[in-house]
């Protein structure tokens, strides 16, 4: 099945990263890690959309959708991951500037991915996490850790109104 196939590949990839002690050293490592932890979710969703609604999407954009969301999480949790888990998902030599650029590049792919979604329920399902990711990135650019509760609530209302 679609879900079994995606979760099997994800489990294999995560096992590989666990054996590597979650050490991300290069952009290629980051791409590989984010593919297994989030890009595959985008691929799985795309396969489900095609199966259930006949909606076809671009695989690379689906991966970008997942990667973009994960890159925002990496940025948001960077210090906590380091302090509490002793792990950094940031490639060697990268500053937050490069990590922001990585997130923005993948969120741009996610925005393009959204254009392939033609069924309202599917669009809503994907649009809210993406809108929250964009606004969280903006909040972090402004020096805040996260969005306020009021901003989250307003974003939910905005997405539902579309």
Name the predicted role of every residue range:
Residues 1-69, 75-162:
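Catalytic cores of Mg2+-dependent Asp-rich isoprenoid enzymes
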């Amino acid at each position: 099945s679609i879900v079994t196939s995606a979760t099997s590949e994800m489990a294999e990839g995560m096992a590989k990263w666990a054996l590597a002690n979650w050490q991300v050293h290069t952009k290629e490592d980051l791409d590989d890690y984010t593919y297994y932890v989030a890009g595959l979710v985008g691929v799985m969703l795309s396969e489900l959309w095609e199966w259930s609604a006949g909606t076809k999407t671009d695989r690379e954009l689906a991966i970008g959708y997942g990667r973009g969301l994960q890159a925002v999480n990496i940025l948001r949790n960077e210090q906590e991951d380091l302090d509490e888990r002793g792990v950094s998902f940031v490639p060697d030599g990268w500053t937050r500037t490069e990590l922001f650029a990585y997130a923005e590049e993948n969120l741009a792919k996610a925005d393009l991915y959204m254009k392939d979604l033609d069924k309202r329920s599917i669009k809503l399902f994907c649009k809210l996490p993406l809108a929250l990711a964009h606004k969280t990135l903006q909040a972090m650019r402004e020096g805040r850790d996260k969005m306020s509760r009021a901003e989250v609530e307003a974003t939910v209302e905005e997405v539902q109104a579309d």
